[in-house]
UniProtKB/Swiss-Prot annotation:
Record keywords, A-Z: Cytoplasmic vesicle, Exocytosis
Protein location: Cytoplasmic vesicle, Secretory vesicle
Gene: EXOC3L1
UniProt organism field: Bos taurus (Bovine)
Keyword Magnesium: no
Source organism superkingdom: Eukaryota
Oligomer and partners: Interacts with EXOC2, EXOC4 and EXOC5; may be part of the exocyst.
Lineage: Eukaryota, Metazoa, Chordata, Craniata, Vertebrata
Stated name of the protein: Exocyst complex component 3-like protein
Sequence similarity: Belongs to the SEC6 family.
InterPro entries: EXOC3/Sec6, EXOC3/Sec6_C
C-alpha cells in the first residue's frame, strides 16, 4: 500500500485544536522579553546593541519554530499510524467474531449428534466389561474356594500363606474393579471379613508374644512379617488403611499388661507384699526373655526391650494408681509399697540390674507414684501406726496399773532397784517404729519421729493421770494397796529410765530442742511422783507433830524419836530408787520434816513460863536439830543441802536472855531467811512468853527497817511455806539448798 492509499485510509485529524502548553509558553516568553527590555531601558548604554539582540532573537525564534514544526510533524505521523493500526485491529476482531459464531454453531450440532450416540457408548462400555469378565471368569469362579482356603489357613495359624492368598484375592479384586469402573462384584464381599480375621489372628499372635517366643517362635515371626509386609503395600481401591503394624504393637503391649497386671491378678487385702515380691522376680525375667527370645523375632525398629520396659512400667503405674483409688491400705501394705517403689523397683534387683541393657532404663519415665501419692501413703501409714502405738502404749500402761495393786513389792533388778519392763517396752515400741522407717525415706522417718514424740508425751500424761487416780483411790480407801509407797517409788525409777533413754529417739538430723516437750512432761511426772510420796510421808508424820511443842516435848525426846523412826522407816524404801531421784527424795523428805516442825512451832500450843523453860525449849530444839541432821546424814543426804540449820537459828531466838536484843536477833534471822514474816516472828515471840508489847513492836520494826537481805543463789523458800496459825500440806521441788 503506497502513501497515497494509506493517507486515504487514515482518518483526518480535527482542526482548530491547540496545545494546552502553548498559552503558558507564550506567557513565559513575553515575561522574559519584558524583563530583558526593562533592563535595557534602565541602562541606556545597552541601546546600541539592540540591533544585535534583535537579529539574535530572530535567529533563535526561527530555530525554535523549525524544531517545533519537526516535533509536531513527527507526532502527527505517529498518531496517524496508530489510528490506522486500530482500524486494522477492528477489522480482525470482527472477522474472529464471525469465525467463533460459526464454531459455536458447529459444536451445538455435534452435541446433539453425541446425544444420539449415548446408547451406543453405553453398549460399548458394557461390551468392554463383559469382555473383561469373560476373560476373568475362570479366576472369579475360584474366588469362593480361595476365600474358604484362606480362612482355613488362618484357622491353622499359617499366617504367611493366608496373607499371600489374601493379597492374590485383593489383586484380583483390583484387576476386576478397574475395567468395571469401580463396580464391586458380590463375589468379593467376603474379603473384608477375611482380612479382619487375619488381622485378629496377627493381633492374637502378637498378644501372646512371650509364650510364642518360647513355644512357637515361627508363628510370632509370621505374624510380625505379615504386619510389616502389609504396612508397605498400597492398593488402588478406596479402602481404609488396615494399619496392622500399629495393631500388632498395641497387641504386644496389651498382652504383656494382661499377663502381669490383669484384673484377676490384682492383689487382695493382705496380699500386696506377696504380689510385689512376685513382680520383683517376674519383671526382670520378662525383660531378659524379651531380649533373648522376642527381640530376634521382631524388626530392629520395634525396639522390643525398650517397648517391654516402658509397657511394664506403664502397666505397673496404672495398676498402682487403681490400687490407691480402692480401699485404704493397711499399715503393713503401705510400708511395703513405699519401700518397694522407692528402693526395690529401681534397685539392682529389678530395673537397675546391670544385666539389663540401657534400653530397659525407665528412670526418665513418670514415677510409679507421684509426690502426692507418696505424701498420701506416708500420712496414711503414720495415722495407722499412731493408732496402734497408742493402743500398745495404753495396753502397757493398763498392765502396769494392775501391777500396782499386787500384794508383793515391786520387782527389783540385780542392783536392788525397783524395776519394771514398762520403760523398755515403751521405748522399744517407739524406737522400732522410727528405725524401720529409715529404710524407706527421710520424710517418713521425720513423720514417724514426730508421731512417736507426740505419743510419748500423751503416754506420760496418761501415766500421770493414772498415778493421780491410783493415789486418790488409795487415800480414800476405795482400793486396798498393800505397797503404795514402793510402787510410787518404782514409777519414779520408770521416769528416770525414760529420761535417761529418751535420747535414743533423737536421730542425728533432728534439730536441738525437739525433745523439749517430752522432757517437760517427764519433769512434770517426776514432780507429781515426789509430791505423792511426800504426801504419804506427811500422812504418817502429822499425828506425831500434833503433839509438838508441848510439856512432854520439853521433858522427853520421845516425840522426835518417833518422828525419826517413822521417817527412817519410810525412807528405807528410797534405797530402791536410782540416783539422782533418791537425792531429790531425801532433800524433799528432810525439808518436809523441817516444815512440819516449823508449822508445829507456829501453832501456839506452848508458851514458856520462864527462863528455865525457854532454855529447856532451846536445848530441845538444838537436840532435835542434831537428831534430824544425824538421821538424814545416815540416809545419805549431805549436810550442805539440809534445812535443819533453821532450827538452830530459832534456838538463838528462844535462848536470848535479854529481850531488848531481840531486834538484832530478828534482823539476823531475816538475813538468813528472807521469807520470814512478821507473823512467824510474832508466833516465835509468843513461844518465849516474856516479850512485852513494846519489845514485840521493836523487834517487828527491826524486821521491817532492817537492810534488805542479799539474794543467794540456790536459796529456797522455807518460812513462806509455813502457815500461821493453821498447818497445811506444802511441798515444792525447785533445786537448791535451804541454807
Amino acid at each position: 500500500m503506497d502513501s497515497a492509499a494509506r493517507d486515504k485510509t487514515q482518518p483526518a485529524l480535527p482542526t482548530g485544536l491547540e496545545w494546552p502548553e502553548q498559552e503558558r509558553a507564550e506567557q513565559l516568553a513575553r515575561g522574559a522579553a519584558l524583563k530583558w527590555a526593562s533592563g535595557i531601558f534602565y541602562r541606556p548604554e545597552q541601546l546600541a546593541r539592540l540591533g544585535q539582540y534583535r537579529n539574535r532573537e530572530v535567529q533563535r525564534t526561527c530555530s525554535l519554530e523549525a524544531r517545533i514544526k519537526s516535533v509536531v510533524q513527527s507526532y502527527l505521523e505517529g498518531v496517524k499510524t496508530g489510528v490506522w493500526q486500530l482500524a486494522q485491529a477492528l477489522e480482525a476482531v470482527q472477522g474472529a467474531r464471525e469465525a467463533l459464531g460459526q464454531a459455536r454453531g458447529l459444536l451445538r450440532d455435534m452435541a446433539e449428534a453425541a446425544q444420539t450416540l449415548e446408547p451406543l457408548r453405553e453398549q460399548v462400555v458394557e461390551h468392554k466389561q463383559l469382555q473383561a469378565l469373560s476373560q476373568l471368569l475362570p479366576r472369579l469362579r475360584a474366588v469362593p474356594a480361595a476365600v474358604a482356603h484362606t480362612q482355613t489357613l488362618i484357622d491353622a495359624q499359617r499366617l504367611l500363606e493366608a496373607y499371600v492368598s489374601l493379597r492374590e484375592l485383593e489383586q484380583l479384586q483390583e484387576e476386576t474393579c478397574v475395567p468395571l469402573g469401580g463396580l464391586e462384584l458380590p463375589v468379593f464381599e467376603g474379603l473384608g471379613p477375611l482380612a479382619e480375621a487375619l488381622g485378629q489372628a496377627v493381633e492374637a499372635a502378637a498378644g501372646a508374644a512371650g509364650q510364642l517366643a518360647r513355644e512357637n517362635p515361627a508363628l510370632l515371626v509370621a505374624a510380625v512379617r505379615v504386619a510389616e509386609v502389609d504396612a508397605g503395600c498400597t492398593t488402588s481401591l478406596e479402602q481404609a488403611p488396615r494399619d496392622w503394624r500399629q495393631r500388632c504393637l498395641r497387641a504386644l503391649q496389651q498382652g504383656l499388661e494382661r499377663v502381669h497386671f490383669g484384673t484377676s491378678l490384682q492383689p487382695g487385702p493382705g496380699e500386696l507384699a506377696k504380689w510385689l515380691e512376685a513382680l520383683r522376680v517376674a519383671l526382670p525375667a520378662e525383660l531378659a526373655m524379651a531380649e533373648a527370645l522376642v527381640a530376634p523375632c521382631c524388626p530392629p525398629h520395634y525396639k522390643v526391650v525398650q517397648l517391654w520396659a516402658h509397657t511394664l512400667h506403664g502397666g505397673l503405674r496404672r495398676c498402682l494408681q487403681q490400687l490407691l483409688e480402692g480401699p485404704e491400705l493397711e499399715e503393713a501394705d503401705t510400708f511395703t509399697l513405699l519401700h518397694w517403689v522407692l528402693h526395690v523397683y529401681q534397685g539392682p534387683e529389678m530395673m537397675g540390674s546391670l544385666e539389663l541393657g540401657p534400653e530397659a532404663d525407665v528412670s526418665d519415665l513418670e514415677p510409679l507414684l507421684t509426690l502426692e501419692n507418696i505424701e498420701q501413703l506416708e500420712a496414711t501409714f503414720v495415722a495407722k501406726v499412731q493408732a496402734k502405738v497408742a493402743q500398745w502404749l495404753q495396753k502397757a500402761l493398763d498392765g502396769e496399773v494392775v501391777e500396782w495393786g499386787r500384794e508383793q513389792e515391786p520387782d527389783t533388778d540385780l542392783s536392788g532397784f525397783y524395776h519394771s519392763p514398762l520403760p523398755a517396752i515403751v521405748l522399744q515400741i517407739l524406737e522400732e517404729n522410727i528405725r524401720v522407717t529409715r529404710i524407706v525415706s527421710v520424710s517418713l522417718e521425720q513423720r514417724v519421729h514426730g508421731m512417736a514424740l507426740s505419743e510419748l508425751s500423751a503416754f506420760l500424761r496418761s501415766f500421770t493421770d493414772a498415778l493421780i487416780r491410783f493415789s486418790r483411790d488409795h487415800l480414800r480407801g476405795e482400793a486396798v494397796v498393800p505397797h503404795y509407797v514402793p510402787y510410787l517409788l518404782a514409777t519414779l525409777n520408770h521416769q528416770l529410765a525414760l529420761s535417761s533413754s529418751v535420747s535414743v529417739l533423737q536421730p542425728k538430723w533432728v534439730v536441738p530442742g525437739v525433745l523439749a516437750p517430752v522432757e517437760a512432761e517427764l519433769d512434770k511426772l517426776q514432780k507429781r511422783i515426789c509430791r505423792l510420796v511426800l504426801e504419804a510421808l506427811l500422812a504418817e508424820l502429822q499425828p506425831l507433830f500434833a503433839a509438838l511443842p508441848s510439856r512432854r516435848w520439853l521433858s522427853s525426846p520421845e516425840l522426835l524419836d518417833d518422828v525419826c523412826k517413822r521417817t527412817a522407816r519410810f525412807c528405807q524404801n528410797f534405797q530402791h530408787v536410782r540416783n539422782p531421784a533418791v537425792q531429790l527424795l531425801l532433800v524433799e523428805a528432810e525439808r518436809t520434816v523441817v516444815l512440819q516442825y516449823l508449822s508445829a512451832l507456829m501453832q501456839g500450843r506452848l508458851v514458856c513460863r520462864g527462863a528455865d523453860e525457854r532454855t529447856q525449849a532451846a536445848e530441845r530444839m538444838q537436840h532435835d536439830a542434831a537428831q534430824l541432821q544425824e538421821l538424814f546424814l545416815g540416809l545419805g543426804l549431805e549436810e550442805s543441802v539440809q534445812c535443819v540449820p533453821v532450827l538452830l537459828a530459832l534456838k538463838e531466838l528462844l535462848n536470848l536472855r535479854d529481850p531488848t536484843l531481840l531486834g538484832l536477833v530478828v534482823a539476823g534471822l531475816r538475813q538468813q531467811f528472807p521469807d520470814v514474816s512478821e507473823d512467824h516472828v510474832s508466833a516465835l515471840l509468843d513461844l518465849r512468853g516474856d516479850v512485852s508489847r513494846e519489845q514485840r513492836l521493836a523487834a517487828l520494826s527491826s524486821l521491817r527497817a532492817g537492810p534488805q537481805p542479799s539474794p543467794q543463789a540456790g536459796r529456797r523458800a522455807l518460812f513462806s511455806l509455813v502457815p500461821t496459825p493453821a498447818p497445811s500440806l506444802a511441798s515444792c521441788f525447785p533445786s537448791g539448798s535451804c541454807a
